[in-house]
Structure formats: C-alpha cells, structure tokens
From Swiss-Prot:
HAMAP family: TtcA. It is an enzyme of class 2 (transferase). [4Fe-4S] cluster binds at C128, C131, C219. The gene is ttcA. Its cofactor is Mg(2+); [4Fe-4S] cluster. Pathway: tRNA modification. This is tRNA-cytidine(32) 2-sulfurtransferase. Disulfide bonds: none annotated. It comes from Colwellia psychrerythraea (strain 34H / ATCC BAA-681). It is found in: Cytoplasm. CDD domains: TtcA-like (cd24138). The thiolation reaction likely consists of two steps: a first activation step by ATP to form an adenylated intermediate of the target base of tRNA, and a second nucleophilic substitution step of the sulfur (S) atom supplied by the hydrosulfide attached to the Fe-S cluster. NCBIfam families: PRK10696.1 (NF007972). GO terms for biological process: tRNA thio-modification. Catalyzes the ATP-dependent 2-thiolation of cytidine in position 32 of tRNA, to form 2-thiocytidine (s(2)C32). The sulfur atoms are provided by the cysteine/cysteine desulfurase (IscS) system.
Amino acid sequence: MTEAQLTLPTTKLSPTQKTQFIKLEKKLRRNVGQAIAQYNMIEDGDKVMVCLSGGKDSYAMLSILMLLKESAPIHFDIIAVNLDQKQPGFPEHILPEYLDKLGIEYHIVEEDTYGIVKEKVPEGKTTCSLCSRLRRAVLYKAAKKIGATKIALGHHRDDMIETLMLNMFYGGKMKAMPAKLVSDNGEHVVIRPLAFCKESELIQYSELKHFPIIPCNLCGSQPNMQRQNIKRMLNDWHDQFPGRIESMFTAMQNVVPSHLCDSNLFDFKSINSTSGIINGGDTAFDEVAIEAPQDLSMKNQPNADQLLNVVEVK
C-alpha cells in the first residue's frame, strides 16, 4: 500500500477540505514524530502492538504510525490488536473489515471481561476502573504472545492534562500519564505516541478520514463524572483564556523541583547560606514575565538536528 493510499480518506473531500486535511495530517505526523524522538518510543527492529479500540484516537494513532513507518529511517513492524470484551451490541465485523482494507497484520482477542465487570460492580456504578485493569491484563498477555516489544496506547495531550488535574484535585499528587513507562507487570514498555496531539485536532482528523467509529458506551457504564468535570473546566479555560492549556502542558515538561515542596525530589535540608542561589532563588512575589505559549515545534528542542530524520514529513 502506497503512502498516498494510506493518507487519503476513503470518501471524496472538497478542495477546501483536502487542503485542510493535508495540513492537519502533516501537523499530526510532526507531533507524533517529535514525541517518538523525544522519548525514544520506537527503536530499530521494534514490533509495535497498536491497541485499537475503535475510537477516534486509536484509529488516528494507527493511521499516523503507518505513515511514519513508510518514511522513518528505522525499521519497525506494526500489529494492530483489538480486545473484543463481549459487550452486548459490539459490532464485531467493523474492525476486521477496516483492517483487511488496510492490509495490516492484526489480531482480535476475545475475552469476556464485560461479564466479569457486570458481576463485580453494582448496577449504576462506574465500571471503567475495573474494566481498564482487566483490559490491561489481557493486552499484556496478547503482547507477550505475539512478541511485541512496545505497546502503543492512544492517549493524547488532553488526556494527560486531565489526569494531572484529577490527581491534584482528588488524589493529592502531581502525577499525570507518562509518555513512556514500564507496564504494571514489569514485562513491557508502553508508549503514548499521541502525547503531543490535541484532542480537537484528532476529532477533526477522524471526521475527515471518516473512521468507522465504535461507540465506547456499549457497556452502559456511567462516565467518570470527576474526569468529565475536569474536561469541562479545561474547555472553559481554553475558550476564555486562549493558550492556557498549551502553557499547562509546557509546564509538565518544565518542572523545577527546588521550587515545589517534595523533599524526595529535592534536598531542602542541606540548603544553607553557602548553597548559593538555586534556580533563581525566591522570586515568588515577583511579577512573572508571561510569554505567549508556543505550539510544539522543533526550534526549542535540544539536538533538534538529530530529530529531523524521524519527524520529517516526506
């Protein structure tokens, strides 16, 4: 399959939509390529298991990774994996038909986690937490079976910011979603290639590509209200204060432990009058110089010249 076949949507676009699509896809490719390079997500010879749920994010992740594979200076394999959790009404034909058209290797893993969740969680309660744990266990098992070296999940920038706010407001921790981590069982490396991608752009991309979306509410579970509240708050901030969300994500990549309060991250006890000024000293009450948040780009990245081969859109 050629890059042009991978790129163009299956339905006809107007000239304006086509221009919009090309610009958007180029930006998503650049952002995914930058995340891969910055966190060393994919290496030569990797077998990447792309977890495909049937939602907009995982479809977009698969699409962009397939494009990058065509132009990357390294070789890596992609295997799409979907977990059929036996939810009532799940359209089992959609993903196989879509993946057959792409001509990509894939596996449909059938595991009745839905039945377990319904048995364990009282009616009307949110099932997402238990469902997520069961799903991870099945996917880790699948990754081991197919020999995957990386597991790719479709969480994006907005998911990461929401998780940070959730943990701050409800968990008392400054903790978000890492772009790269070791799996719960200690056997796999999990990556989030969409870490630098905005949800709004993924929605737009999905609409232009006309992905065959499978709804995520087939289980009948109520949404996580805390996360929904955080999402609404962030959306309001985005509307009222343009650039605030971008600034928040930049802050997540620019942490100054000496100016927080965690003694595990910084040795406050050893500070004395001979320690010198640390990271600017006490500027808590000085007026902060506000700079317009910059969109993710290569110009402020260290070793930018080394990343271009991975990120370059050909």
